[in-house]
């Protein structure tokens, strides 16, 4: 085993990872949008059972804060559109990113209200409530820290239901407060609900391109309970009518995509039912229904829930609800990616540039892993020193493979050499590299984040492919500076083309990730020379043995 064979191992692991990414994405193809309404069988407690009908035609009111631009339908009080002014749709664009949308091509809404036996959103009680509002447009004025949008509905019996959206400056968490005033002679039984519904198939204008071979981020539903901190639920699964039905005190339900999320967080001490449902016409939903509340005659009861609608900013999400920050898609290595991101963010607080922060964290990570790297190179050097003895043994034993294997193991034992010693450090390092990959791909902070010169977006590919080419050049230098005992012509050809193959792979990778690999390769070159000098003093390395 030597450095160049090590590159081959890295390549095989890398290609295996890419194949796994593609398989993970394609093993459950998305269902085609249905042209006719389906009759679905849903789990107990699903949207169909709980009475969450579709929105009707009401008046559209607009709400603008410093970070949100929402459109709310007074028929039901659903949030039908959500724009995020602080996040442009594309780099250099003045058009804000649209998270929630209601168009003939695509549906993504945040629904809420009061269902239950006497709730106005229960279909058994008629159409959804048509709320009254005092004006059509609400704006958070300069110097104002809170904006309230009250919507009131009075039923035929004279009972008053008020739904108030509460916005705060700089906040993507919207509190939804409910007030139920019972003017009758019998108790009212009501339950709050919150539901997110979305079209399964993305239209062209919503496709971010995150489905290419270089990147696979999760788009779907998720939920959290005290027993299950974070569980994903694929849209495909919901579309196949394999629905969620769990009861929980606390927790949340959400819909996720790269960089952005929506979530309903019930705020009560009772038990909530979390559910999913296939609503037909290619639309799926995830939601919650709270435990019923009895409002006695002449009394007024208050209930509340919270809607998160915005970017996946981890510290802010964690402050809104436990484990809501886990919605950032760091994959199965999240337990490594999260502390790495916290370190990256801490570095950024000093240097103020995410690109330079990536460079610094690369030096830190590679410095921490230096003992493993040194052990890897030492093991490979010992293996090279044994090559003449191994070759002589093979010539002496001829085709007797069994004796070759026995004597080779005896030689390794006598020389105190582990033949897999060069692989183990690499295998240990790979999860860290993959965790960095997920961290750089899933963090909203790197979206449209500039570095220097021509790199204006670390989350996008290099428009001129300069960074991938530089990465390939650094791989070439590592290869040329590494001693080798490879004599097989096929392996030599593979080694020769390895930098080219990696360069092609990285052409479509985000600039931040390519920058990490360039710096990591430069650190490898430096560490390689330091290690070789130490090995020379021990007689385990000779510069004359290097082959160009």
UniProtKB/Swiss-Prot annotation:
Cite the residue spans of the region called Disordered: 28-56
Recorded GO molecular functions are: membrane insertase activity
By sequence similarity, the record places it as follows: Belongs to the OXA1/ALB3/YidC family. Type 1 subfamily.
InterPro entries recorded: Membr_insert_YidC (IPR019998), Membr_insert_YidC_N (IPR028053), YidC/ALB3/OXA1/COX18 (IPR001708), YidC/Oxa/ALB_C (IPR028055), YidC_ALB_C (IPR047196), YidC_periplasmic_sf (IPR038221)
Could you tell me the Gene Ontology terms of the biological process aspect for this record? protein insertion into membrane; protein transport
Keyword Metal-binding present in the record's keywords: the answer is no
The protein's matches in HAMAP family, at most eight in alphabetical order, are given as: YidC_type1 (MF_01810)
Entries under CDD domains matching the protein: 5TM_YidC_Alb3, EcYidC-like_peri
Q: What does this protein do?
A: Required for the insertion and/or proper folding and/or complex formation of integral membrane proteins into the membrane. Involved in integration of membrane proteins that insert both dependently and independently of the Sec translocase complex, as well as at least some lipoproteins. Aids folding of multispanning membrane proteins.
Question: How is it placed in the membrane, per its record?
Answer: Multi-pass membrane protein
KW Transmembrane helix (keyword) present: yes
Q: How does it assemble?
A: Interacts with the Sec translocase complex via SecD. Specifically interacts with transmembrane segments of nascent integral membrane proteins during membrane integration.
Spans through the membrane: 6-26, 350-370, 424-444, 458-478, 499-519
- What's one GO-annotated cellular component? plasma membrane
Chief place where the protein resides: membrane
Please report any disulfide bonds recorded for this protein chain, giving both cysteine positions. Answer: none
Q: In what ranges is there compositional bias, type Low complexity?
A: 29-42
**Protein name, please?**
Membrane protein insertase YidC
What UniProt keywords apply to this chain's record, in alphabetical order? Cell inner membrane, Cell membrane, Chaperone, Membrane, Protein transport, Transmembrane, Transmembrane helix, Transport
Location within or outside the cell: Cell inner membrane
